[in-house]
């Protein structure tokens, strides 16, 4: 098992990664000061049916433990469920010394974290991720819900007390969720750990290789990339925006295709390829785009849909949180391991997207 220490200006905490990580949960709760009064576990139907009782049983404590379960899917990261969670918290007498446990993937981590950030102006929470994708979202304190006009538009920065990454929970994931999470692993490697990138190319020939010791190795290498960036820039005023590599187009694809019709990781994978495609033009460098494209396709990542309106995508990219005064800002790659946030004109993005779309056919 590998423990990773996270340090930000507002909080320090540990990420527990391994096959026995859940055994730490009781100790984590018992060591909190002031003492935890009661616990609310927030989960979704799919995860709760598999793992909720396991977590309840692992909590060897006297305090009351209750659960709030929402339907599964990104569209459930909504104001309605956020409000309903607050109602449940009030009905079950949560107070300022209570604890919320986020049991699930990124959707649940975001929703539960934002409930924790806002209930009585902020209470403690612990992340218990159940997906590979959540290795990214569970660390760093960004919590949010979606608005019909944009993803993660209503939220806060609220760091967890701990992250308990119990890897056996991941074994029930369908292949599309392994692929989705692996995209964020690739992202961390490309922007911050070139050695990990080369290791992935050698050691992960198929998604089935993302298991056991290789999985733990990947998590203990990818999470520190994010941790190091968050330590420098907790509230995304500077370098933390580098973590959005691939997300400008990725989020636009999610919005245009409809949440749930493309996974977050599939969108980010297409977005990273486009960022590399555009970076070669902007920086006049060779980033081996063709080789990267074939590598991504090998894992089953989708191509850019040929029937999507480039004009609509450009409009959605202008709604991205990095956009400034209506100008698109994208994270582009100067070389492997070196990225920058760059202002790009609508025309440049439009021309590049059209060329990229044709190349992906």
UniProtKB/Swiss-Prot annotation:
Binding site for NAD(+): 72-77, 130-131, 142, 151
Cofactor note as given: Binds 1 divalent metal cation per subunit. Can use either Co(2+) or Zn(2+).
Gene: aroB
Entry function: Catalyzes the conversion of 3-deoxy-D-arabino-heptulosonate 7-phosphate (DAHP) to dehydroquinate (DHQ).
Catalytic activity line of the entry: 7-phospho-2-dehydro-3-deoxy-D-arabino-heptonate = 3-dehydroquinate + phosphate
Gene3D superfamilies in the record: 3.40.50.1970, Dehydroquinate synthase-like - alpha domain
EC number from the UniProt entry: 4.2.3.4
Record: residues binding Zn(2+): 184, 247, 264
Listed NCBIfam families: aroB
Keyword terms of this UniProt record: Amino-acid biosynthesis, Aromatic amino acid biosynthesis, Cobalt, Cytoplasm, Lyase, Metal-binding, NAD, Nucleotide-binding, Zinc
Subcellular location: Cytoplasm
PANTHER family per the UniProt record, alphabetical: 3-DEHYDROQUINATE SYNTHASE (PTHR43622), 3-DEHYDROQUINATE SYNTHASE, CHLOROPLASTIC (PTHR43622:SF7)
Keyword Lyase carried by entry: yes
Required co-factors: Co(2+); Zn(2+); NAD(+)
HAMAP family: DHQ_synthase
Record's protein name: 3-dehydroquinate synthase
GO CC field: cytoplasm
Organism of derivation: Bacillus cereus (strain AH820)
UniProt-listed SUPFAM superfamilies: Dehydroquinate synthase-like
Recorded GO MF terms: 3-dehydroquinate synthase activity; metal ion binding; nucleotide binding
Pathway: Metabolic intermediate biosynthesis; chorismate biosynthesis; chorismate from D-erythrose 4-phosphate and phosphoenolpyruvate: step 2/7
